[in-house]
Structures are given as structure tokens and as C-alpha cells.
Amino acid sequence: MSADRFVGAWRLLSLEARTSTGEVSYPYGQDPAGHLLYSREGYMSVSVMQARRVNFASDGLRAPAEEKLAAFDTYSSYSGRYEVRGQKVIHHVEISLFPNWTGKAQKRLFEFSGDHLTLTAPPVQIGGVEQNLVAIWQRLHSPEA
């Protein structure tokens, strides 16, 4: 498949963690927010967060450790080059909030349905349970001038 179908901006509709027994949880809550961008030049960027995050007590960037931890636990972001191979899109992470992903590849199975894109990650351990993260994105269209 051509990478052309990916190009553009996408808005996160849902992000679920699914177990092999069918249990579903919501790592960023049931109403997450996020954007996913794919460029024609072969770059991508994704940001996902829990909706209605709590503001820091002050407007300064230096915050207490508890506030920083809460901010980290409710937000994720990375970017880099991408390529399409068969039914997988591979994100080659160059920068990431989670430092362990920098320099690594994040592989996602993909499926298009109309203006929706579903990305499914390989199983990961969350809370000691193997789960697949499934994100559903909706293509954003340019606002009318």
C-alpha cells in the first residue's frame, strides 16, 4: 500500500487497551485527546493525552515532582520518519517523551475505513497483563475558507 493514504492530520477518537480475554481499559480515559500527523516527506508526529488534565499550581515550568509525574502519566508524544510495509506502518522514533523509545521502531497494524484509521500495537505489558493498544483516528479536513 502507498503511504499517500496516511498523509494528513488525524484526530484521536478512542484509545483502548484490550486483553486476549476481551477486557477493555482506557489508558488515557474514555475521552482522550490526540493528534497524529503524517507528512508527504515521510515524517510523522503523534501526541495523546488524557482530556481535562490538571494544571500546574504555578505557570512556571518548574513544578513539584508530583505535578510532573501526573503530567507524564497523562501524556505521550513522539515523532520521526515513517514507512509502510504490507499491513504495517512503522514509526522510526527520533524524539519521544518516553526516552526508551528514541532510536527504536514502533510498528502498528493499520486498517482504513472511510475517513477512519485504526492502528493496533503489538502486545505490551500493562499492569502485568499483556494487552494490545488500539487507537482509532479520524481524518481532519481543512476548515472552509
Regions found by a protein language model. Give the residues of each.
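Lipid interaction determinants
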Residues: M1-S77, V84-A145
